[in-house]
Design a protein with these regions (language model features):
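Short polybasic amphipathic segments
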Residues: 1-2
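Nucleotide phosphate-binding/pyrophosphate-handling subdomain across enzymes
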Residues: 8-114
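Phosphate- and divalent-cation-binding pockets in alpha/beta enzyme and binding domains
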Residues: 41, 78, 126-129, 173
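A short acidic, helix-capping loop that chelates divalent metal ions and anchors anionic groups
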Residues: 65-66, 170-173
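C-terminal helical cap/extension that packs against the catalytic core
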Residues: 104-160
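Short beta-strands and strand-loop turn motifs
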Residues: 163-167
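Phosphate-binding loop of NTP-binding sites
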Residues: 172, 183-191
């Protein structure tokens, strides 16, 4: 049988970022279509869908800078997805509890997209050393998340994004990734 292409949505219409999220939308849309849901209903639903909290969650825009909370990016693989989802120059807040991860792949994923790496937590020196070894030197060390958000706000240019996608667990500074993400949102809103 011949396959028919049915346009449902353009990725620019979606409120969620990231190729992995767009692939999930395509899968859900295909299943809904084959279950008999109208193209119009599918389009409306996928265009209204927003990110789950702490997963590349859009927080706000201030002074032309977009802020994203990806606190659930608690390991390098998950945090890579956050970086890949950004479509602007990015100031990346990373670091936290040391789970003995390698950060090389995460740092290599910056690929010219990350302007500054702003580090907090137990892993900040370890990540800084790995980044410098790999040739990334635009690094700022901070005492805590509040300072990191403030530094990012000062360094960011209109059109940039500030992304909390730490590649580390939250323990030591926060009870869990939800608390870390909620604090990030509070600090951003207080700017």
């Amino acid at each position: 049988t011949e396959k028919e292409e049915i346009p449902i949505v353009k990725t620019g219409e979606l409120k969620i970022l990231g190729r992995h999220n767009h692939e999930n939308v395509m899968a859900a849309a295909a299943m809904a279509y084959y279950a008999g849901v109208s193209v119009e209903s599918i389009h409306k639903s996928v265009c209204e869908f927003v990110a789950v909290p702490h997963r590349i969650e859009y927080v706000t825009e201030k002074n032309g800078v977009a802020y994203y909370n990806d606190s659930k990016g608690t390991n390098p693989d998950a945090a890579i997805k956050g970086i890949q989802a950004m479509n602007r120059p990015t100031l990346l807040i990373g670091g936290g509890y040391d789970k003995e991860s390698s950060y090389d792949e995460w740092i290599e994923s910056f690929d010219g997209k990350v302007r500054y790496l702003v580090l907090i937590g137990q892993t900040k020196e370890k990540i800084k050393a790995a980044a410098e070894r790999l040739g990334f030197t635009d690094i700022i060390l901070c005492e805590d998340l509040k300072e990191a958000v403030q530094i990012c706000a000062e360094k960011a240019n209109p059109g940039d994004a500030v992304l909390l996608s730490p590649a580390c667990a939250s323990w030591g500074q926060f009870d869990n990734y939800e608390q870390r993400g909620d604090m990030f949102k509070e600090y951003v809103k207080a700017l």
